[in-house]
Amino acid sequence: MKRTIRALCALLTIAGCSGETYKTIGSLESLDPQFGKLVSPDAKIEIIAEGFSWIEGPLWLPTEDCLVFSNIPPNKLWKWTEKEGAVDYLEKSGFLGKVPRPGFKGAFDEAGSNGLLLSPENKLVLCQHGLRQIALMTTPLNDPKPEYKTLTDRNHEGKKYNSPNDGCYHKDGSLFFTDPPYGLPGGADDETRETDYSGVYRLSKDGKVTLIDDQLERPNGIALSPDQKTLYVANSHGTNAIWMAYDLNEDGTVKGKRVLKDVTKRVGTRKGMPDGLKINDEGYIFATAPGGVWVLDPEGKHLGTIVTKEFASNVAFSPDKKTLYITADMLLLRVKLR
């Protein structure tokens, strides 16, 4: 009987066995007393699922009481619950053809979806690398199918996007998003690339696309402050690893920009790069970076790090903001917050 249970658990490594005590990884590094007010000093970084290829875009679905996330190379979404662990959620999340695509360069083909978000109407919105668009899943959240409505697939110049990476909604219904070339088969040198830059964009409710910035080499994670007055964007570039802050007018248009924090000198010291980020209700920023997840105050002061050991790509809060979920390469992690 014990052998049978062990064999079953081995088959379900990627999902985890319900009721198990999770393995832990990493540590917490506090640089400021405020860090301990946000992350409990005795919190553990739990590995709640593992065995993936390269995961991204964690998103909690309140109506389904589950976390969904992208496993980019296999072109699919998974969902995680405490009861079931990780199970399949959606096939063909970023590309409707076969993967890997012919001629891709790099360690693996990034044709799948990346960032995930909920529309104001509680529909799943996907940043689709392979299809080079941002799309809305037209089927219900409790009956997911690869059936999509394109929200935007061409920029302000009528050119195809590179591979939309991440996005966030403004209270007025407009959508901010980033467009680096990671999802193109040939990367930045892909022969089908139509722009020679990586953009930060705004899609208004009426469908108008506005270019916010074309000067970032690899714009990536993106999030809004609680008061909607500041847009934060991570730039995942080895020689210009920064977070930008864009000051917004009431209508969501940009009136100014500045570098919030530069961590270029930290690149290579630990696994990671400025990538996905989220902001809590008090304006504190939980941003993936060298070493794991950095916690920053609204002015960019580094308060402490949730050290993940693996390359952290993105984060998501539980509905009550008391739990932080972290996608870290092949691992799905969880840490309790205060």
Where are these regions (language model features)?
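Sequence-structural signature of mature extracellular/luminal beta-sheet repeat domains
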Residues: 17-338
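Sec-dependent signal peptide recognition
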Residues: 2-10
